[in-house]
Amino acid sequence: MNKEKLFSDFSPVSSEDWKNKIVEDLKGVPYDKKMIWKTSEGFNVNPFYRKEDLPVGCENALPGVFPFTRGNKPCNSWLVRQDIKAGDAAEANAKAKALIANGVNSIAFGIKGKLVTPEYIPALLDGIDAESVELNFNVCVGKVVLFTQLLVEYYRQRAFDLEKVKGSIGYDPIGKEMTSGKVNDSYTEVIKALVAETACMPKYRCIAVNSGKLNNAGAYITQELAYALAWGNEYLHAATQAGIPVDVVAKNIKFNMGISSNFFMEIAKFRAARTLWAKIVEQYEPECKCSCKMIIHAETSEFNLTLFDAYVNMLRTQTEAMSAAIAGVESITVTPYDAVYEAPTDFAVRIAKNQQLILKHESHLDKVIDPAGGSYYIESLTASIAAEALKQFLAIEEAGGFHKAVKEGVIQQAVEASGNERRAAFAKRREVLIGTNQYPNFNELSNGHCPASKGCNCGCHCDGTKETGGKTLAIKRLAEDFEQLRLSTEESGRRPKAFMLTIGNLAMRQARAQFSCNFLATAGYEVIDNLGFATVEEGVKAALAANADIVVLCSSDEEYAEFAIPAYQAIGDKAIFIVAGAPACTEELQKAGIVNFINIKSNVLETLKALNAKLGI
């Protein structure tokens, strides 16, 4: 058989040659400034990767083999989960059975503490096959042991095979402490009780690491991962110190992680997570390497969901679910697109469910095992994320561990700082949400929708906790400040008109008018674009005839010296005058009294707040 190499006539090109060619094409623009992506995650991303960039050992890694970078099993079947806030048992039961009949094979019930009674569980789970459907329960920490006892008793009464029932009891006392400010120093005893109660159900996990709430609060990817690892290690250490074998503890921990819209980095995050967790558990010397597997449930982010242009939320959650599926997680929840402003409708829940079913039955992602394996880019991202997360993890451990950091407010402050950094970037459109701070729907109204309130209303007190007034985790969506701005405009009862006075150079006036329309429409203003005016006088006359509240001069930098001052003087105090751009003659224009300029460096949020104030909104 002839094994002639393809392209043997072409000599190999080195990485240095590629870089030199890029530098040449940049024509003097600094390579590092233009081509290196300086991420917020603590590492840089190169413009290209080659075989020599692959981390050592990854070429021999296999799915289902320690340290499980490529997945916990030699297949990629994940569970499609949907969450139900259980109130009325019959209603929640009907919802669950309808979802199961239409492709969902994992249900998560959120149950208030006051509902934990012997009568409630049979009514909630009536007619649901606990052996074929994964059942997960998020119960108030103060009632979790009682609930678990009642659940096991129910399974026995209904003659389910306890070796086959599968699911989780989401006991996460540190997570509760983080959001409530109530310290729980006695959680180890609860873990011991839960492990004992669920010992008869080997496919149940009773300890949860809910790092998805960090994602929802604005944590960076490496930050969420590092904290999740330290969080899990805290439970692992406490339980083994209490005498529970490491294999038992590790097999009882489930990680509930968030998924941001950073597609490739999220794929890499989950791969890095499995690798690092396997190596952490290995340090405890388990009897079986299978105890080192990190079981991950992935939840699409709420941090980037928006009130306005809410259908775009479907697109966000679709790419997020896709990245988690490619990464090989065990189960996925897609948040319904309307969860920002209402209890999700049946339509929204159906779409959320179908988003995953499309990935399975139409895209066939469940038929491909770790397609990212061997990718120069994703393998390098995996290594970079792992290295940065490990560094942060070790810093937490050296400072006394995760629980100590939570009690002192260190974790909450760090995540809040990250969220604030991201909001600052969002205000300047360095971070973008389509339909909110960029490319808004000009004619959209809220239709009475307002952000849904969040909070614990479990209906009971948390056993083993004490009030400390500790710092709580601030969970705030990225879009909220812009949404409030737009809602304020609506509530004012009038919609300010922003008129584009386009004049001069055709390309520049169109570009600046488009920029200005997008800029001002994010506050809910009515924007009036124009093809162009022959003279300043013509443009000003049209603006005043339109009863414009704001007039934006759109032209080229060179022509502003000619047009801006006459236009400003003609407008006078009849409207707010803005120049679109940052022309060289800015100082001269300011001396003439022009104070409002908008450009790509503007803080969009603060500029719009100032305009609202001037408009009396």
Please provide the spans of the model-predicted regions.
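Intrinsic disorder at enzyme termini
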Residues: 1-16, 34-37, 43-68, 330, ...
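Catalytic alpha/beta active-site cores
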Residues: 1-262, 292-297, 325, 331, ...
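A glycine-rich phosphate-binding loop feature that marks nucleotide/adenosyl-phosphate handling sites
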Residues: 36-44, 170-174, 210-216, 251-260, ...
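Conserved, mostly hydrophobic/aromatic
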Residues: 42, 103, 159, 277, ...
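Mobile "lid/hinge" segments at catalytic clefts and subdomain interfaces of large enzymes
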Residues: 202-239, 315-393
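Short glycine/threonine-rich loop-to-helix capping motif typified by GTGT followed
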Residues: 219-225, 260-272, 301-314, 342-352, ...
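Glycine-rich anion/phosphate-binding loop at the beta-strand->alpha-helix junction
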Residues: 229-232, 256-344, 351-352
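ATP-dependent carboxylate/acyl-activation modules
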Residues: 454-455, 459-528, 541, 590-591, ...
